[in-house]
Amino acid sequence: MATFVLTYRAPENYTLGTPDGIAAWTSWFDSMGAHVTDAGKPVAASTTVGDCGDIRPLGGYSVITAGDLDEAVALAKGCPFVGQGGGVEVGQLVDPPGSGDPA
């Protein structure tokens, strides 16, 4: 299994902590089951340094495991932000070259 970081981009005017929002996130995390290795945390404030293009502010992160990038993307599609004007960035975590750890 590979490890992936999910970074969330919140929809405009998203309000953190509403009962409906909490229920949607809980349901999504429950549906991913053992794939979730670190549920992560929301981000209260963020900014970018350098040229990051025109992206929404960072809304939070999680860490999951999946067989490959396609499976990780399939899991990410259930994120409550998807379809509401927000989104998820999916990236595979790897050990740096020369770290001595197997990739």
Question: Which sequence ranges carry the predicted segments?
Answer:
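Conserved, structured core segments of small domains
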Residues: 1-103
